[in-house]
Regions:
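A polyanion-binding, active-site-adjacent surface
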Residues: 1-177
């Protein structure tokens, strides 16, 4: 489903449904949960493959730690964002507003001026409103969405290469890139 056709987002605790203008439901992702880590001036954001789990999985967690090292991040407790926020329907615009407010609040309290999202295609287009590998704005904050950690594990040669190329091209290569 194209992001422009999304009328509402509804969660039942396990799956998220995108609802179009005709009331049809689409389930491109499970209840989404992302965790954000401040790394210098960049919020590095990871989509959890299992939103019911308390943290990233064993392999995605190791990959996340490696990526955070590229940004020179110190280990700390991640900040988490759930979408939709409740089991009530939430429009794609409301989800974007909630995510924008979440990062604006984090930036005011902890710093950070941009965000790098490691998320799947569905979440990037529905909530960030843009295609992956292209810079977008999240409110006033520059943002870039690249492949999710799970995609980087499933297809490392393709996903890591295209994600890294986009990060370099848009100035999101971390403190060591």
């Amino acid at each position: 489903m194209q992001a422009g056709r999304v009328q509402a987002v509804q969660a039942d605790g396990h799956y998220t449904r995108l609802i179009d203008g005709a009331g049809r439901h689409f389930c491109p992702w499970s209840l989404s949960k992302v965790e954000a880590h401040l790394a210098g001036d960049t919020w590095v954001v990871f989509q959890q493959e299992d939103p019911q789990a308390p943290e990233l999985g064993r392999y995605t967690g190791a990959l996340a730690a490696s990526l955070l090292t590229v940004f020179g991040a110190a280990p700390e407790r991640p900040r988490r964002f759930y979408c939709p926020l409740t089991k009530q329907p939430m429009s794609a615009g409301e989800a974007t507003q909630a995510l924008t407010a979440f990062f604006a609040g984090l930036s005011r309290q902890h710093g950070g001026r941009r965000a790098l999202f490691c998320v799947d295609h569905s979440l990037a287009t529905a909530v960030l409103g843009g295609e992956r590998f292209q810079a977008v704005k999240l409110g006033e904050m520059p943002a870039l969405a690249v492949d999710s950690l799970q995609e980087m594990l499933d297809r490392p040669a393709l996903a890591k290469k295209r994600s890294w190329q986009a990060m370099v091209a848009h100035g999101f290569a971390g403190s060591r890139g």
